[in-house]
Amino acid sequence: MSPPQTTLPVTEAGLVPLLQPYGPYVLVRKLAEGGMAEIFLAKLLGADGFERNVVIKRMLPHLTNNPDFVEMFRDEARLAAKLAHPNIVQIQELGFAEGCYYICMEYLAGEDFSTTLRLAGRKRHYVPLPVVLRVLIDAARGLHFAHEFTNEAGQPLNVVHRDISPSNLYLTYQGQVKVLDFGIAKAESRLVNTRTGVVKGKYMYMAPEQARGKEVDRRADIFALGVSLYEALTHVRPFSRENDLAVLNALLQGELKPPRELRPDLPEELEAILLKAMAFKPEDRYPTAEAFADALETFLSEHLSGSGAMPLGAFLKGHFGEERFTERSRIPTLATLTATYGGAAAGAQGQAPGAEPHGTNLYGVLAREGDATSAQRPGMSMRPSSPGVPAHGAASRGSTSPESAPTAGGRRWRTLAVGLAGGLMLAAAGIVGYRQWMTTPASVSLVPATVPVVEAVAPEAAAAQVGAPMEAVAPVGAAAQAGSLTDAVANGAGGDVGETDSAQLSVDAAGVTETDEAGLAGAASDVEAEADEEGADAAPVRSKKASSQKRVTLGIDDVQRVVSRGRARITTCFERYKADLPSSQGEVQVQLTIVSSGKVRAGTRGPLASSGVGRCLEAQAERLRFPPHRDQEVTVVMPFSWRVTQ
C-alpha cells in the first residue's frame, strides 16, 4: 500500500567553505541561522595535525547583551552536557570567543527522521517497519535517561524535552539514533525557568495538557513519541488541519483516525501500543518512556525478528544513496579544503552572515533555495530564550537598546520601550489557540515579554469573565499615519510552530489595510514552522470591506495583523500614563472578547485595571475591528510589556 506522496526533494549544492578561525576551531561552512544563533560545520584542531569535525552553535552578536538570552543559551549547554547517553546528542563545550557564546557539539553523519520520512513519501513507499520501530525504541531510551537524570545530590531534575518530533530525532549512517535539541527542555536545574501557562513546542506533536499550558511531565514526551510513530507508520500527521486553531481543536478533542484506517496492513497489536502512547489523559499513557520502548521491543521481537530486517545504517545508505552517504561521512581534511578552496574561501569570509543563498540543517542536510521547510529547522534549534518568543521570520528580531543607570537625583523619564508581547491566546467554543508574535514600532524599541497563561474560555462564559467595558478614555492622539506601520509587521512575527508569514502593512487615512508579502520564506528559523510541518496555513489579511464578505474562521494571523494596525495608539497609552506604571518595567494583560461581527469588548487584568493606562488600553483595544467570523466569540489575552529607559 502506497502512502500519500509528500514533496521534499533531497537536493545538494556545493558551498564555498569559510575556513575562518574561531577560538580553537576553524569554521568550515555555515549551515543555518535563526533568531538566536547560527550553526557552523567546524574543525577542532590540535597538535601534530590533529583535527575533528564538530558543530558550532554561536549566539548572534546582537543578543550577547541580553542577559535572558545568554542565560537560556548557557542553560541549554549545561543541561545537555550532563545527559551523556548514546541516544542523546553530545555537547562538548560551552565557550566564549570574539564576544559571543558558543556551544560545541558532536558532528553526526546522517539524516533527521523527518527528512527520511518525507523522502520515503516522495518515493511512494513506507520506511520499513523494523527501522521505524528501532528509531522510536532508541529515542525512547534516550528520553528515559533524560527523564530519570538526577543532580550530584541524587535529586531528580525532572527533565521534560517538550519538543519531540521527527525533526528532532537524528539517524546516523552508523546506525545510531540521537535525540536533539534540549533548547526548551524543562528541568529543575535551569536558572531561567518557564512558568505554568507558557506553551512551548510544536502544536502538531504536543500533548493536550501541554497545549493548554498546564504543568507537564515525562508523559508529554511519550505522547509526542506516539505522534511521531503515527506519522512514521502512516505518513499522516494525526492532528493536521487547515489552521492552528483547527489543529488545537482536534488535539484537545482527541480527534484522530485510527492508524489502521489509514494503513490496514498494520498489526492490531502495534496500533494498540501507539494509541496507548497517545492517550488523551496522561494517566492512560505509558508511565515511562522505557515502558513504551519495552512494549515496542517486545512487539518487534515477537513479530518481526525473523524478517531479515536491514540494519538502520544500511537502510539509510540505500535510502539516500551512495553519493549522499559519502558527502556526509567523508568531510575533507582542512589541508585538502585549503588547497582546493583557498582563494574562494577567502572571498566567502567577506560575506555578511546569512548572505548565502542556501541553508542546511545542523548536520549538513542542504536546504533548497527559498525553501523554509528544510532551511528553518536545524537539528538543534536556535530558540530565543525569552519564554515562548519564536523567531519565525527574519533572524535578527528582538534587539533592545541598552538601559542606562538611574541618575543620583532620581529617575528621568526619557524613553519608554513597550513590547507588544509575545503571546496570543484565542478561545472559540472552549478551544485554545496560541500564537506568539511581536511588533516592533519604528519609534519604540522592543522588549522581550513573558507569555500569557493559557486558559480555555467557552463562548458562553466569555461575557461573564470580561464584564462590561470600563470607562473609556478619549482616543489618544496618535493615530497611525499612512505607511507608518510598515516596519511593525515586516519585522514582526509570524506564527508559532508556525508559518514564516510576514507582511508589509500600509494604512490609509481611513485605516483600511492592504498587504504585500514580505518574502521571508527560506530564512533560517529556530522553530519548525512550515505549513508542511505544522499543517496550518496562514489566514489572509482582510480589509474592512471583508465585513460584507462571507464569515471566516478567525485565525491567529488575522488577530496579529489587526492588533498590529493599532500598535501606535496602544504604545501611546504607556507614554501618556507613564506615571501609573508601578515600576521601570513590567507587564499588563488585556483580555479581548471578539464577537462574531468583529467588534471587541476589552478588560484590563490585574492592578492596572482601574488606572489611566488600563482604561486607555481598553479604549484603544475596543477601537479595533476584526473580520466577521463564524464563532460566537473569540477570546484573546494579550500581554503588553514595558520598559522605561533613562
Curated annotation (Swiss-Prot):
Domain Protein kinase per the UniProt entry, residue ranges: 25-300
Enzyme class label: transferase
Annotated region (Disordered), positions in chain: 373-410, 521-547
Catalyzed reactions per annotation: L-tyrosyl-[protein] + ATP = O-phospho-L-tyrosyl-[protein] + ADP + H(+)
Protein modification: Autophosphorylated.
SUPFAM superfamilies reported in the protein's UniProt record: Protein kinase-like (PK-like) (SSF56112)
Active site: D163
Keywords, in A-Z order: ATP-binding, Cell inner membrane, Cell membrane, Kinase, Membrane, Nucleotide-binding, Transferase, Transmembrane, Transmembrane helix, Tyrosine-protein kinase
MF-aspect GO terms: ATP binding; non-membrane spanning protein tyrosine kinase activity; protein serine/threonine kinase activity
Binding-site residues for ATP, renumbered to this chain: L31, A32, E33, G34, G35, M36, A37, E38, I39, K57
Acidic residues compositional bias, start-end: 527-536
Periplasmic topological domain residue ranges: 1-415
Membrane spanning residue stretches: 416-433
Record GO cellular component, one term: plasma membrane
Main location: membrane
Annotated EC: 2.7.10.2
InterPro entries in alphabetical order: Kinase-like_dom_sf (IPR011009), MasK-like_C (IPR049806), Prot_kinase_dom (IPR000719), Tyr_kinase_AS (IPR008266)
Topological region Cytoplasmic: 434-646
Annotated compartments: Cell inner membrane
Sequence similarity: Belongs to the protein kinase superfamily. Tyr protein kinase family.
NCBIfam families the UniProt entry points to: myxo_SS_tail (NF033768)
Subunit structure: Interacts with MglA.
PANTHER family, per database record: MITOGEN-ACTIVATED PROTEIN KINASE KINASE KINASE 20-RELATED, SERINE_THREONINE-PROTEIN KINASE NEKL-3
Function: Essential for growth. Interacts with MglA to control social gliding motility.
Protein name, UniProt field: Tyrosine-protein kinase MasK
Organism whose genome encodes this protein: Myxococcus xanthus (strain DK1622)
Encoding gene, per UniProt annotation: masK
